[in-house]
Amino acid sequence: MNLRPLHDRVIVKRLDQETKTASGLIIPEAAAEKPDQGEVLAIGNGKILDDGKVRPLDVKVGDRVLFGKYAGQSVKVDGNEVLVMREEDIMAIVQK
């Protein structure tokens, strides 16, 4: 994938959601909510501040992140669906 996001934008691939509950019930794909976790695939150069300086992003490529249900814009690239969002749409980085 050859995408380079601009400024404070981030490219995120949604992580697959569990299709089975803890009690063993299988959740049909139509009823499953979209996952709110993903892996950062690419990041922009940073946020341009009012004084013209660039603040580097806190997230890095490979980070696992949490984001809101309606965060980002979904796009297809090379047959894969990814999200393009601003860093401020990311709520947390999942620590390993």
Swiss-Prot record:
Q: Which domain of life is it from?
A: Bacteria
Gene Ontology cellular component annotations, sorted alphabetically: cytoplasm
Q: Which GO terms describe its molecular function?
A: ATP binding; metal ion binding; protein folding chaperone; protein-folding chaperone binding; unfolded protein binding
- What are the BP-aspect GO terms? chaperone cofactor-dependent protein refolding
Q: Which InterPro entries match?
A: Chaperonin_GroES (IPR020818), Chaperonin_GroES_sf (IPR037124), Chaprnonin_Cpn10_CS (IPR018369), GroES-like_sf (IPR011032)
User: Signal peptide: which range, if any?
Assistant: none
Q: Where in the cell is it found?
A: Cytoplasm
* Pfam families assigned to the protein according to its UniProt record, in alphabetical order: Cpn10 (PF00166)
Q: What is its main location?
A: cytoplasm
Question: What does the UniProt keyword field contain?
Answer: Chaperone, Cytoplasm
- Binding partners and assembly: Heptamer of 7 subunits arranged in a ring. Interacts with the chaperonin GroEL.
Q: What does this protein do?
A: Together with the chaperonin GroEL, plays an essential role in assisting protein folding. The GroEL-GroES system forms a nano-cage that allows encapsulation of the non-native substrate proteins and provides a physical environment optimized to promote and accelerate protein folding. GroES binds to the apical surface of the GroEL ring, thereby capping the opening of the GroEL channel.
The UniProt family comment states: Belongs to the GroES chaperonin family.
Q: What is this protein called?
A: Co-chaperonin GroES
